UniProtKB/Swiss-Prot annotation:
Residues 712-795 are cytoplasmic. PANTHER family: CADHERIN-87A (PTHR24028), PROTOCADHERIN BETA-12 (PTHR24028:SF334). One of its GO terms (biological process) is cell adhesion. Residues 27-690 are extracellular. GO terms for molecular function: calcium ion binding. Keywords: Calcium, Cell adhesion, Cell membrane, Glycoprotein, Membrane, Repeat, Signal, Transmembrane, Transmembrane helix. This is Protocadherin beta-12. Pfam families: Cadherin (PF00028), Cadherin_2 (PF08266), Cadherin_C_2 (PF16492). SMART domains: CA (SM00112). The lineage of its organism: Eukaryota, Metazoa, Chordata, Craniata, Vertebrata. Glycans are attached at N418, N436, N487, N567. It is found in: Cell membrane. The chain crosses the membrane at residues 691-711. Gene3D superfamilies: Cadherins (2.60.40.60).
Amino acid sequence: MENGGAGTLQIRQVLLFFVLLGMSQAGSETGNFLVMEELQSGSFVGNLAKTLGLEVSELSSRGARVVSNDNKECLQLDTNTGDLLLREMLDREELCGSNEPCVLYFQVLMKNPTQFLQIELQVRDINDHSPVFLEKEMLLEIPENSPVGAVFLLESAKDLDVGINAVKSYTINPNSHFHVKIRVNPDNRKYPELVLDKALDYEERPELSFILTALDGGSPPRSGTALVRVVVVDINDNSPEFEQAFYEVKILENSILGSLVVTVSAWDLDSGTNSELSYTFSHASEDIRKTFEINQKSGDITLTAPLDFEAIESYSIIIQATDGGGLFGKSTVRIQVMDVNDNAPEITVSSITSPIPENTPETVVMVFRIRDRDSGDNGKMVCSIPEDIPFVLKSSVNNYYTLETERPLDRESRAEYNITITVTDLGTPRLKTEHNITVLVSDVNDNAPAFTQTSYALFVRENNSPALHIGSISATDRDSGTNAQVNYSLLPSQDPHLPLASLVSINADNGHLFALRSLDYEALQGFQFRVGATDHGSPALSSEALVRVLVLDANDNSPFVLYPLQNGSAPCTELVPWAAEPGYLVTKVVAVDGDSGQNAWLSYQLLKATEPGLFGVWAHNGEVRTARLLSERDAAKHRLVVLVKDNGEPPRSATATLHVLLVDGFSQPYLPLPEAAPAQAQADSLTVYLVVALASVSSLFLFSVLLFVAVRLCRRSRAAPVGRCSVPEGPFPGHLVDVSGTGTLSQSYHYEVCVTGGSRSNKFKFLKPIIPNFLPQSTGSEVEENPPFQNNLGF
């Protein structure tokens, strides 16, 4: 209808344009007509000639015709009579919607001269539409505690008619709880409200339904209806009530577990969560809670433990039903246990001994009595146990039996026996009773802890941090309980010189080993000790294992130059004749390294020289030799700096400074001091100084060597009882030489060395080979170890 109203507005605008146009061209008259909607096509509207004061012949002669702006010809003109007739049925609601009045504008076009005559056609509404509710069913949720007089809004009905034919009133079918009140909104439309006349009660009537009727003002009036459902929202104002205040049931004493005993049921007049009930035992004894169980949702009471008529003949249980709001009701259930005499054999246990010690022979495990209430053959019984277990049955008087062990048991082989004692009568049919017992074998401390390895090899790099975890040992015990709990300990060292307590410690609970202090490979290359594992049994059993700790060398010592001495005194000066051939041995740099292995492999190189290319240093042995022939252009004095570097990671190094003096011959040597003597000094004084210097240097060097050897021998003598071991080395590089004496060279190449101070060539004299002293090795070691040794010099 809104679309119809918009179209009508456009029609009016176009008609207005034509009217204005006609008025501008010629004078015009307006004709007003009234017609009821829904008239049939061809119905008479009015006489145009009479209304406008025209002759009928004029309409015909001037070609009068009716036009509209939307080319929709609703009217037709009979030029013979001047009557306006309906060309089609008019629907006011389609043409104008809810607008009132509904006026259509047309023009009568006449020629000679051209003239527009305005026609206004008012379409009168008839009551051709009934009120309609958009929703055929309305749902209202109203709390049952709503006060009387409360107002609830209802949906209004829609009526396409207007005016008096629109919705006029609302009614509901009579009821005691509600009435309808009519309200008018600002656009003059009427809408209904539902007023509560009587308090609601969910338990009395949880839902009300009635018909809402909308009436229009037409004649005859039309109506529309909708169903109104009022759902009363419950509040928790009712306590649960049981179907029975007292339940009495009977149950056989041999009922199986899980059997349904009885189902209790209660209801609650409330709704929603207020009517959701849960069932529980109220103030039930421990026997009741052990024997029975109630389903909180369904109220099913089931059996959870065997019944014994001889022990308890009946149970009285108070059941409580609680709703979601906290209100509750109670009922009593009496359960009568019915005795069953099935005449099956019975086993009465007098005593059971479990667990039993594993190493005790012929131990009585169980004493029991059997009986059958029948008589004759039906009362005669045979008692038996399985044959594949180390137990026997022994009969006694009055049907008493004892179950005994046949031989000593071994818990480590089998710690538990499930034994079925079967008693069968001789009746027809034969009935039998089985009694199952579980016999546990208690542990006896008959197994000592066993280490996972007979010996352990642990590696730790020197200069470690104190309290460093260096490894773990582990032992297991086949026993159980406290007999299987193992404590670890360090056993007293067999070497009285080994300070074991200050070297390592052990965690008594888990066997973790820790180095207590920083280890020095040069002082201690390895040591071994024994550890013990003791269980907590009585008496306690223990076992031992050997632990070897191998100290790995770290490059923590720089090379030390033995010759020439670098002690800040007068430098060493070597004399070289001018006639020396290439490769002439000037001197030999001697150095040692306190480390071992590749950390002690030394290489030599010339770092600085006064005359580059004149001298060279052999990388293997530190020999300083001439590289070419000497010439007159060469300086007489030369200063050489030799770099000594080990092969560690990172490498360490030291330098040695040499002074070389070129002389014509050795008969009259010339040895200047580091500071040049005055030019006027006599040759005799220079010779004296040179001899004194050489003697001093040789004495200092010899004294240093002896002192160093003595210190090393003292340290070796103290460390020798502790035991020394060397880690297997890699291949020895061809460009390196080992002079440390710590075991990095092949054993056949270890010699004592002495520098001959009186020789101008400063060569070495090899006095005697050093024979390695092998310590005996233990058998069964997991890691192949080099036998520890030390040399006479202690390098």
